[in-house]
Amino acid sequence: MKYMVLETFRPGCKARVYERFREKGRMLPDGLRYIDSWLEKDGHRCFQLMETDAPELFDQWTAAWSDLVSFEIIPLEERERQD
């Protein structure tokens, strides 16, 4: 299943988020897959498209970042595209 993850950087933590990312990467547990991401123009929120069959893996991943970021994790319904 795919999920949209809204990350909101805690006040004053944006630089620390990127520093940790450079040092440790995304720190995703096996079974949680990053697909793509977009940064809001003001740079305070990031929207990440992710995929997993085990949504409980989000608990492990968010615990590694929760001191710097708050999360909203939204399950997505996949539908057939009609262009």
Which residues are covered by each model-predicted region?
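Short, well-ordered coil/turn elements that cap or connect secondary structure elements
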Residues: P29, W65-L68
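Conserved short beta-strand edge segments in small beta-sheet-based binding/regulatory domains
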Residues: D67-R79
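Short, flexible helix/strand-to-coil boundary loops that buttress conserved ligand/catalytic motifs
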Residues: T62
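Short S/T/G/P-rich N-terminal loop/turn motif that feeds into the first structured element of a domain
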Residues: M1-I35, L39-R45, D53-L57, E77-D83
